[in-house]
Amino acid sequence: GNNRGLAAASGDYLVMLNNDTVVTRGWLLTLLRHFQADPQLGLLGPATNHIGNESMVPVAYKSIEEMPAAARQYTLAHMGELYPMQTLAFFCVMMPRTVYELVGPMDETFGRGFFEDDDYCRRIEQQGFHMACADDVLVHHHLSASFDKVDGGERQMLFERNKSYYESKWGAWMPHRHRPQRRN
């Protein structure tokens, strides 16, 4: 999957984007501008409505039809803002080709999912780069649309196996968390 796409991609920046996402106007150019402003930025993802880490933000829409207007309002209120993160979920990420060439392909030992994104983030950190969530980009995510088709027992077995493999490489895994909510 991802490794084949990354190897075939051309251009100075690479994007991994799941098929269970809906992007908004200007998302790609806005991500690109952050890289142009910060040469130490190694990986960047958008804010989103639904994910198991700090990229999730409160959204003001109830339907996909309302999403573009609500996303525009949110992103305009957060223009230029980056939220530093140690681990991004790969439902939507961008990286410079130079970073990909230093870090290399994703570790295929992880197989179908769980921890491959955590592992890749550790490898990016090893090369001296940092990661962030671009709060001025919002991408809608229908969380785990394809993974929900996997049997619960099989999913748990894959999680435990990959967690063990990740920890053999990097030490104890720190569970993802959501960011603290802002008080107005």
Please give the residue ranges for each predicted region.
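Short, high-confidence coil segments that cap the C-terminus of an alpha-helix
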Residues: 11, 38-41, 129
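Short aromatic/hydrophobic "clamp" motif used to bind/position activated sugar donors
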Residues: 14
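Glycine-rich, basic loop-to-helix element that forms the pyrophosphate-binding segment
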Residues: 1-9
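Catalytic metal- and UDP-sugar-binding loop of GT-A-like glycosyltransferases, i.e.
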Residues: 17-19
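A short, conserved alpha-helix in the catalytic core of glycosyltransferases
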Residues: 26-32, 80, 84-104, 109-138
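A recurrent flexible, glycine/aromatic-enriched loop bordering the glycosyltransferase active site
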Residues: 7, 50-51, 55, 63-98, ...
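Active-site-adjacent helix/loop segment of glycosyltransferases
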Residues: 52, 58-59, 118-184
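Conserved donor NDP-sugar-binding/catalytic core segment of glycosyltransferases
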Residues: 21-60
